[in-house]
Amino acid sequence: MRHQWVANRRGQSNVSQMHYARQGQITEEMDYVAKRENLPADLIREEVARGRMIIPANVNHVNLEPMAIGIASKCKVNANIGASPNSSNIEEELDKLRLAVKYGADTVMDLSTGGGNLDEIRTAIINESSVPIGTVPIYQALESVHGNIENLTADDFLHIIDKHAQQGVDYQTIHAGILIEHLPLVRDRITGIVSRGGGILARWMLHHHKQNPLYTRFNDVIEIFKKHDVSFSLGDSLRPGCTHDASDDAQLAELKTLGQLTRRAWEHDVQVMVEGPGHVPMDQIEFNVRKQMEECSEAPFYVLGPLVTDIAPGYDHITSAIGAAMAGWYGTAMLCYVTPKEHLGLPDAEDVRNGLIAYKIAAHAADIARHRPGARDRDDQLSEARYNFDWNRQFELSLDPERAREYHDETLPADIYKTAEFCSMCGPKFCPMQTKVDADALTELEKFLAKDQVGSAR
């Protein structure tokens, strides 16, 4: 749908949405987002210009349906997919992509580290996807030197970053905030550095005793991004990997650097969102969101979870959705889903489904809590259908219609039960929703109560 839109921008040195927004121009992407969000187009332009909203939309991803990530828009959900050296292939990843989009992923990150030709996998995903695609280019940079971290150079990183930009990746996680002086701060952690990208750079800095090359060459990354309109997703290399490590000096030192990098990118009209933790106890979530807004000048916050406890392997889509709902309520713009396989293995299609639904619930709950216009409309419609025993309408309005119908069918599969005024929980005689309160009866009751109060007053 974007062929003509981007064709009109050919030859321009900066094609970022922020660049146009700061020139006072409402692009086709901004107008499209305004309709999707039911917000004024000029508000979208103002938020993008200010840096509080991004529209990740690489000019080379022409089949993209533009969307927004920011505090003024609905809370979004990202799904991670990706092949590994031990599992998965192109077709399996495309199936995961389709499933993720089906169940409401607003963006998808390809975190492939193996399983075939990474360029082919990425190209296939971009060509198939109508939602923005994000990547972590450091993974392919490491693969390009056959896993020998010490052999990586700054040019290796930039080559892969540029390749991803040319292929149409809409946003890239760039781990530029971890500095060599931050490394001693992880000494007292239980889980050290849990970011894969952060771990790679930490080992590189420890080996060479040199500063993070993504930090020293940050302006070169900016130049690549503004040519293709790639958004920064500034990686939190020192995010806490357990609740013990949350909000520590290492995490906050990197966050301060991420704020400085955000403003450097903005000087060149390049869009930025900032990644966040991780594992955070419930009582620290508000602090983390507020601190990010303060340090990063209100750039959109994109958090992984956070998990609020560490004792539930196999159920971390639940432990993290609790934290995600709270983070969304406090103002986080996008939530990165966690699947039941987190910390245990590579998720399959069913894990993707379960993780996504858990996070769509969290994001929707956050939108309701933030009183976004129209956020509760679907809830009210489903409640009306429930009260009227309109089972098919309930299924239709559910986040996962297939699962809702499946559970109802387990005990009452016949079509006749789709109009029944009960379910298998209460049966035909005990359902409280059968007690329909007649409006006329309520009016008569009010008259009686009014008379009774008068009599009591005497």
Curated annotation (Swiss-Prot):
InterPro entries in alphabetical order: ThiC, ThiC/Bza_core_dom, ThiC/BzaA/B
S-adenosyl-L-methionine is among the record's keywords: yes
Enzyme Commission number(s) from the entry: 4.1.99.17
Cofactor(s) required, per the database record: [4Fe-4S] cluster
Residues that, per the record, bind [4Fe-4S] cluster: C423, C426, C431
Cofactor note: Binds 1 [4Fe-4S] cluster per subunit. The cluster is coordinated with 3 cysteines and an exchangeable S-adenosyl-L-methionine.
PANTHER family: PHOSPHOMETHYLPYRIMIDINE SYNTHASE, CHLOROPLASTIC, THIAMINE BIOSYNTHESIS PROTEIN THIC
This protein's name: Phosphomethylpyrimidine synthase
Organism: Acaryochloris marina (strain MBIC 11017)
Gene for this chain: thiC
